[in-house]
């Protein structure tokens, strides 16, 4: 299911680094993580939905690139975000 406007605003408010922040790597990664989790649940029921699976793989790649950027720019923000989101790395 798609991300509702309320869910999106809640995620933005939680991970924003300052007021009005919607584009920081933290916010983008958090939004992608929620979309990835939702799509993963969808694919558990619809195993043959290969178009959505491709979208999932693209989102995972985008998130990985953003995390690599954040790690390169500010390792402390990276570690904090990984811990807050509960990601493996």
Swiss-Prot record:
> Entry's PANTHER family?
RIBOSOMAL PROTEIN S15, BACTERIAL AND ORGANELLAR (PTHR23321), SMALL RIBOSOMAL SUBUNIT PROTEIN US15M (PTHR23321:SF26)
Tell me, what is one Gene Ontology molecular-function annotation carried by this entry? rRNA binding
User: Gene3D superfamilies in the record, alphabetically?
Assistant: 6.10.250.3130, S15/NS1, RNA-binding (1.10.287.10)
Q: Which residues form a coiled coil?
A: none
This one is known as Small ribosomal subunit protein uS15
A single GO CC term for this protein reads: cytosolic small ribosomal subunit
Query: From what superkingdom does this record's organism come?
Result: Bacteria
Q: What is the lineage of its organism?
A: Bacteria, Bacillati, Actinomycetota, Actinomycetes, Bifidobacteriales
Q: How does it assemble?
A: Part of the 30S ribosomal subunit. Forms a bridge to the 50S subunit in the 70S ribosome, contacting the 23S rRNA.
Entry function: One of the primary rRNA binding proteins, it binds directly to 16S rRNA where it helps nucleate assembly of the platform of the 30S subunit by binding and bridging several RNA helices of the 16S rRNA.
Q: Which GO terms describe its biological process?
A: translation
Instruction: Please list which residues make up the signal peptide.
Output: none
């Amino acid at each position: 299911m798609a991300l509702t406007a309320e869910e999106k605003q809640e995620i933005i408010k939680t991970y924003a680094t300052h007021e009005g922040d919607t584009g920081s790597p933290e916010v983008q990664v958090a939004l992608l993580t929620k979309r990835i989790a939702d799509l993963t649940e969808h694919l558990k029921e619809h195993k043959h939905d290969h178009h959505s699976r491709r979208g999932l793989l693209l989102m995972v790649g985008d998130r990985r690139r953003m995390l690599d950027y954040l790690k390169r720019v500010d390792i402390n923000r990276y570690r904090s975000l990984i811990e807050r989101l509960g990601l493996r790395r």
